[in-house]
Amino acid sequence: MAAMTGLFWQSQAEDRPQWGGFHTRNMVSTETGLPTGFDLETGKNVKWSASLGGNAYGSPVIASGKVLIGANNESPRDPRNTADCAVLLCLDESDGSLIWQLAVPRIGGDDYLDWPLIGMCSAPTVEGRRAYLLTNRFEVVCLDLDGQSNGNDGPFMEEGAHMVPSDEAPLDVTATDGDIIWLTDLRSAVDMYPHDGAHASILIDGPYLYLNSGNGVDNTHKVIRKPEAPSLIVLDKETGKVVAQDGELIGPRIFHATWAPPAMGEVDGRKLVVFGGPDGVCYAFDALSSATAADPIQTLTRVWRFDCDPTAPKENVSSFLKNRKEGPSIIESMPVFVNGRVYVTVGGDIWWGKKQSWLKCIDAAKTGEITASGEIWSYPMETHCVATPAVSNGLVFITDCEGFVHCIDADTGEAYWTHEAGGEFWGSTLVADGKVYAGSRNKDFCILRASKDKELLGTVTFPAPIASTPVAANGRLYINTLETLYALEESSGK
């Protein structure tokens, strides 16, 4: 089964059906012929654009002629449903027109459970005719990639009730609504506690779905309501049943929430799942080889543990709330698994923590407690960092929250150059076609040469802030601001 899954991904090499590279999470694409410049006013190199409403923090995925991306319901696409919903849009890759949407209303009762007005933050993962997503209500859903166009497939048949608040009457399901195959509510399935916004990118390995649980603090930002909830979980792909979870008891050490999706790779013939914990520790577990929906929930076997900030406090971490000088570290980005090494960013929480972070390079072949032995190098940044690295041709590219793009030697951690873009980065870099692409929250999008010799190729100012990661697929570059998705293609438009 795993081999078949790998072949499927290889056969769709031009698509981008997962956020980041397959399993590795590396923000690198093999696409060529991508635009170096574009003009949003004249339409030069702009194939199409699509409105996302507002607060669209997620990044797109592209598969089987469709583009899937998170949006909100600020400008309702279905006039029957005007509630505050997070929305997953399925657009036609050729022209950006709407095929279907999955609208999910807020949890309600406490804004900190499901922050109002933000878009669907999680990027789906597509395999075959199925898409897997963590919704804003912390539900893992399996979706029919064709929506309702081929009928309402079960076993889940309550889409009409699911798309509206619980105190409203169900809507009739139409051809432009999403089709949920199955749904697993993590609040009941693993007894976790939601915080702010659900953020995950599901990793598929054969019959298994790996994702971070989302467990976090309550609205006081000082109490962990569910300290025993797992941080990393595994679901059966066919049924949605939880089949495994970590046993690290990370809960009491959570400073904010569990937002970092896992990565996967092999070293010395051993397949590892690598997870950046909300406690600032990077963990590696053996990948599951035998677990079914009928079995009791397994505990993942830890292979190694690397504390990215060993001198930081590990107990009573809430006492450091709003302390910008000292406190615990948290991992808020995906680890990248390349050539037997793990590259991961770690540091103070962007909202409440110390203004300090690092890019770590870890030897993935180690075992046990490897905090002292596993570090290959460490690159300090005197600010926050929530970005996932891009590792390409011996170089690592990373953005930070002070508005810098960094180019670093992948073997030694030596800095080659930095580029100041002028506004903070929440998204990651994309390396493709010999270029480094990155968009900032001050609306500027920069294009640099992917080289140890710094060369700025261009800067384009967008109409709205960018908090996502650019994506390349099928000869196009996709960039979304908080309001609009742009499909860019060389020689398109005027």
Question: Which stretches of residues belong to each language-model region?
Answer:
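Bacterial N-terminal signal peptides
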Residues: 1-6
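Noncatalytic, solvent-exposed loop/strand surfaces
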Residues: 8-494
